[in-house]
Amino acid sequence: MNKVVLIGRLTKDPELKFTPGTGTAVASFTLAVDRRFKKEGQQEADFIPIVVWGKQAESTANYMSKGKLMGVSGRIQTRSYDAKDGTRRYVTEIVAEEVQFLEWGSSNNNSMANDQFNNGNENGSMQLPDNNDITPIDDGDIPF
């Protein structure tokens, strides 16, 4: 079994590319995942390279940005390639099978949504309409 589940923050904006020929979308990014323990009172993190393919890659690139929290489930994959200097390089990365956006949008969008939810009231409570607009209904008019 090869299964990985991570929750962390993007270290920079995802990089979106398309494969030559088929044009399949592929996004790559690094996820900073906090460790469960602290060293000398400081939180430590691991920086995990992630690759996601297809529509999920496009959505990730379009809606996620540096610092946003996201969940990833997938598998660990290792590969190697020959670098330009002739040396053999080895890469270990997570190939995402599922991504979840746990935070998205800008802080301006979030505050605008909160303003709409709060209906412009400073203390956050919803303003009710005036009673003058309410028409009483006779129970006999209800068809059930």
Curated annotation (Swiss-Prot):
Which residues does the annotated region (Disordered) include?
112-144
UniProt KW DNA-binding keyword: yes
Query: Cellular component terms, GO, for this chain's entry?
Result: nucleoid
Q: Where is the SSB domain?
A: 1-103
- Gene3D superfamilies to which the protein is assigned, alphabetical: Nucleic acid-binding proteins
Which domain of life, per UniProt? Bacteria
Q: Which InterPro entries match?
A: NA-bd_OB-fold, Primosome_PriB/ssb, ssDNA-bd
Family matches, as Pfam families: SSB (PF00436)
Q: What does the record list as GO biological process?
A: DNA replication
- TM stretches of this protein: none
* Compositional bias of kind Polar residues: 112-134
Single Gene Ontology MF annotation: single-stranded DNA binding
Extract the signal peptide range: none
What binding partners and quaternary form does the record give? Homotetramer.
Show the NCBIfam families listed in the entry.
ssb
Q: This protein is called what? A: Single-stranded DNA-binding protein 3
